[in-house]
Each structure stands twice: as C-alpha cells, then as structure tokens.
Regions:
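C-terminal lobe/lid and adjacent interdomain/linker elements of RecA-like ASCE P-loop ATPase modules
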Residues: 5-19, 307, 327-400
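Conserved P-loop NTP-binding catalytic core
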Residues: 53-59, 72-126
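Extended helical coiled-coil dimerization/tether regions that scaffold
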Residues: 8, 13, 24, 221-286
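Electropositive, glycine-dotted interaction segments
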Residues: 124-257
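Conserved Walker B
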Residues: 26, 315-319, 348
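Conserved ABC ATPase signature
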Residues: 58-65, 267-302, 310, 316-320
Length: 400
C-alpha cells in the first residue's frame, strides 16, 4: 500500500484541493462529464460544506446504473496512474465506452494550491496503457508527452525545480510495444510518476502538493466487516487500550447504536469483540449489517487517524437507518473539515438544507450529466425549501 504523505501547505496555510475533474469516453460516460468543486453558490448556511472557496462535502444522487460507482473509479484513476498501486483496480477491466469510436479515455484534473493552479491531464487506452500526458502550472505547460507519436516536450521543467533532471534516462526506459510479451504489463511509466521518484522537490512545491493530494485519496465501498476476525487482529490489538475501546464505543453510540463493548484475547492469540451485557454477546455473530458496516468504516478511515484529501464513499448508507445516515454525515463534516468528501446514496432524507445545501447536492443523470440542485431548476432555492419534497414532486426530473 502506498505510504500516505503529510498534507502540504503553502505559506498561507492552504492545502491542495481538487478544483475540477473532467473525464470522457470512460465506461458509461461517452461524452464529457465534469465534477466542478468551484461552482459554489452564495448560500450562507451550512458553510461547513465549503472549504477555501471550493465544495468540500457533496452528495450525489442518481438512478441505478447511471454510473455513480464508475465516477468513483474515474476520479481515483489518477492514484493508480501516479503511484502504480492497483488499489480498487484489479484484474482485466473494460475501460473505454462501448459505443464510442475514440480509442482513449481522457482525464483532466485541476487542482488549486493556494494561489497556484495545477492541471494534470492524460489519455489512456486501458488502465495500464497511457498514451499522452501533460502538466501545466498557472497556465504554463511544464511538459507534454505523446507516447503514440514518440514526441516529448520537457522545455519548462525548470519552472517546477526539475530543470536538471536527465530526461534521456526516462526516454530510454520506455518499453516498445513489440517487446511486451506478458498480458497487462505496463509499457510506459507516466513521466510525472517517474519525475517524482527521480527528482527532489521542495516541500511546498506544486509537484509535492499534487502527489500529497493523490496519495491521500481514498474510496470506501459499501461492505460489512464480514464474519471472520482474522483480518481485524491488528486493529483489535489496539483496542486492548481501554481508551481506544471506549472511543469505538462512543462512536457507535453517537451513530445511534446504544451499546457497551468488551474485548477478550482468546487462548489461540486472536481477539474477540463482545457486546457487554450480563452475559457477553459475540459481536460478529450478532451485530446487524449496519453495525458491521460502521465497524469497517471506523477501522479503515476513522481510527487510522489518516487525513484523506478526497474520500469517495459509494452507497455509503446502504445498511443504515435514515437517522444514522444523517448522524454520519454530521460526524464526517466535523471530523474532516478540510477533506473533500463525496457521498453517493438513494436516501432522499439527506436531500435537505438541515445538513447540506443546494449547490452541494447533485443528480447524476442517465445521459451522463452531473447537475447541482441549484442549477436544475429555474426556481431560486432557499434555505426554507423542502428539497426532498420538491425532488419527489418531479421538480428536477429533466436532469435525471
């Protein structure tokens, strides 16, 4: 697993944020789809959904099979591109749109780093085969590589402090397609990945900021903790500390699960978590699907004390009661004020100005468009509007 990098800050104290993401010809997204974090309306409520002028908390709705999960893998593609870690990308995968004649999928990431704008874009034929890539900083092209035409422009590397890097070493490392015999072998290492591994950058440089953000991106797919405790032994060992066990107990209670917990080490060295009653009740064999899903979320994200830059939680509340869903949204907003969190759900109870706002609630349509509620109606949406009622009444139907 790729080691997380510490969050990078400018002298103004700003950490890098994703400003805009665009992808085309990827899976069901034949046409260009854009996720614009900078499209902030002027609402003066629930300001904790905004950070440094960009959307930091959003919820995406959409009918089944509109591509909410595909959007997650598209956004996280940069993580594999720049680190080589497979993450959620395992096995042979169909990447290109089945109805398009285009031979590559196009990705574009625009980052805001204090007063600096960083744009990284590339084209891929498959998950591992990159055909073209370009990096720009504040409108100036730093480098551009066309691997199909074998043309390279490294003329502005000095602008990011990499002017002394020997790019000929990189060019000689590129494996010709005819030399590749194993299916799925990477033919070209993206230049930006190679550059970060072979050059030394200042802690506050644009490249360090970009990698810090990418390495700390994460995705959580809906799943329960499963029936076996073996994969949890390391986590359970930390719960031998009574303070850590109490924090987990407090988390469950804050989510609406009234319980007390106990942990025992078994004779075989493994650990067993229990609900503490007059008689101890084994946790894994009796906990509900929602409770197991909460434990998995706690173990993976919350307890690790990681500071994710972007967290995509797909169908995050599939096992939760609507009140627990709302509790978790409030918890995430408070726990991760600077993290850009994207939640997908079918739970319209969260389509509310109590905890969100119209510019942070999106509809992913069957034709591959992503529209904020405030852009999906001619009506001026205000804090007092019942967004869920309007949604069910068909106010936003033409954007579904």
């Amino acid at each position: 697993m790729t080691k997380r990098l510490p969050a990078v800050k400018t002298q103004k104290g700003w950490s890098p944020l994703l400003k805009r993401f665009t992808v085309r010809n990827y899976k069901n997204f034949k046409n260009e789809i854009c996720l614009d974090f900078s499209d902030v309306a002027g609402y003066q409520f629930n300001l904790d959904c905004i950070h440094n002028g960009l959307i930091s908390k959003m919820i995406i709705y959409g009918r089944n099979a509109t591509g909410k999960t595909n959007l997650a893998s598209a956004i996280l593609d940069i993580s594999f591109t720049l680190t080589g870690e497979p993450g959620l990308f395992r096995g042979k995968e169909i990447m290109l749109n089945a109805d398009s004649a285009e031979k590559t999928a196009l990705f574009r990431y625009e980052f805001s780093f204090g007063g600096t704008e960083i744009v990284y874009e590339y084209a891929k034929e498959s998950r591992a085969e990159i055909k073209w890539e370009k990096l720009s900083v504040d409108g100036a092209v730093i480098f551009e590589c066309d691997f199909t035409c074998d043309t390279y422009d490294f003329s502005n590397l000095e602008k990011i402090g990499a002017g002394t890097v020997n790019t000929e070493i990189y060019r000689r490392s590129i494996v010709p397609r005819c030399d590749v015999t194993r299916v799925g072998e990477v033919t070209v290492i993206p230049f930006l990945r190679w550059l970060f591994s072979n050059a030394v950058f200042a802690q506050d440089s644009a490249v360090t900021a970009l990698f810090s953000y990418v390495v700390n991106m994460d995705i959580v797919k809906t799943q329960t903790a499963g029936g076996s405790t073996s994969q949890y032994d390391r986590f359970f060992k930390t719960l031998e500390n009574s303070n850590n066990l109490h924090e987990l107990e407090e988390f469950f209670n804050a989510m609406g699960i009234a319980c007390r917990l106990d942990l025992k080490k078994l004779p075989d060295g493994q650990y067993e978590l229990y609900f503490a009653h007059d008689r101890k009740v084994p946790f894994f064999s009796t906990a509900s699907s929602g409770t197991l899903a909460l434990l998995e979320l706690y173990r993976r994200i919350i307890y690790s004390n990681s500071s994710p830059s972007l967290l995509y939680m797909d169908e995050f509340d599939a096992f939760y009661h609507y009140e627990m869903s709302e509790n978790l949204v409030r918890f995430l907003k408070k726990r991760y004020p600077k993290c850009q969190i994207i939640l997908t759900t079918h739970n319209t109870n969260l389509m509310s100005n109590r905890i969100m706002r119209p510019d942070c609630l999106f509809i992913l349509s069957r034709c591959g468009t992503l529209t904020a509620l405030c852009r999906a109606t001619e009506r001026e949406l205000r804090e007092g509007h019942n967004l869920e009622k309007m949604y069910k009444a068909g106010e936003f139907d033409r954007y579904e």
